[in-house]
Amino acid sequence: MSQDSAAVPPLDSSRSTVPPIVQLRKVDKDYQLGKVLVPALHEIDLDIQPGEFTVIAGPSGSGKTTLLNLIGCVDVASRGQVTVDGRDTGKLSEKALTQLRLDKLGFIFQSFNLVGVLDAFQNIEFPLLLQKTLGKKERHARVQALLEKVGIAQYAHHRPGELSGGQRQRVAIARALVTQPRIVLADEPTANLDSTTGTAILDLMQELNRQGTTFLFSTHDPRVVSRAGRVVRLIDGRVVDDQATAAEVATAMAIH
């Protein structure tokens, strides 16, 4: 197996003296649907150490996306504590949450969440404009480099409506990476990609992971699971397995 495709060794968080970059304690999430209260997550305890390449696995409806949304500060827990980069997100103002997302987090949404009136280049550049830390030359150089790395430089000036699902997925991936975040949250990042493109994107993510970026995925894709250093399995909103070997889970997912 090549270095790029090899699984990242799992981190033993019980032995680490480095504070977790993400920590959840007794986290519940409920949704109100009319008069019915629907539980989505139940008493989640989870530590993610800096530099992990971790997969959240589980069937549809198990709570994977909900968990990422809580960590990504785009939703709030019903009960419990979510800490990201040392900050208790439940105690932050909306302005502080926005700044935390902008400075520390990159989020690859399953639904892309691209701005329809902006072209691919502008969508990727947008977080840098919000950050206001780079000049125009530096911004454009960074965006162009990512367009080339994800293989869509020729579509830089196409709007989302002019792109295929796979091309929009790659724009979303580049946008999540452009601020060089400490943590990347990826919700089914390979779902719209063919095998060759998916492999190239995962290679890029593992390269960034080796440079220190923390990655947390939700996925059904055995290709992603097989590369993980750690796999956390959810069923019905509960953690049922943690630190399972990637090979075992990938094999089970391929069979079922």
Regions found by a protein language model. Give the residues of each.
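ABC family nucleotide-binding domain
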Residues: 19-228, 234
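ABC-family P-loop ATPase nucleotide-binding domain
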Residues: 1-30, 241-256
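H-loop (His-switch) and adjacent beta-strand-loop-beta switch element
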Residues: 231-244
